[in-house]
């Protein structure tokens, strides 16, 4: 009889632990949501306090066009 109680208790403990693991693993933020760390995002990228697939540097494109215009005139 003691064996059954122990087995049932262990079985229930395993179920509870699996449930807790499933709940904590689903705790991520979708794209464009506010974030502070990469681990908070489902896509594992936090760029400028927002979950984003690619980090963009503001002004980089404008700077590149300026160089192309400068070299194109020569």
Curated annotation (Swiss-Prot):
Primary location group: secreted
Protein name: Conotoxin fe11.1
GO MF annotation: an example: ion channel regulator activity
Modified residues (Proline amide): 58
GO cellular component, as recorded: extracellular region
Entry similarity comment: Belongs to the conotoxin I2 superfamily.
InterPro entries: Conotoxin-I_CS (IPR013141), Conotoxin_I2 (IPR020242)
């Amino acid at each position: 009889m003691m064996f059954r109680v122990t087995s049932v208790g262990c079985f229930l403990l395993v179920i509870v632990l699996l449930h807790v693991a499933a709940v904590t693993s689903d705790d991520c933020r979708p794209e464009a949501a506010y974030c502070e760390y990469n681990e908070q995002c489902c896509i594992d990228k936090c760029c400028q306090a927002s979950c984003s697939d690619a980090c963009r540097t503001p002004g980089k494109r404008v700077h590149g066009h300026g160089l192309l215009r400068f070299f194109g005139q020569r």
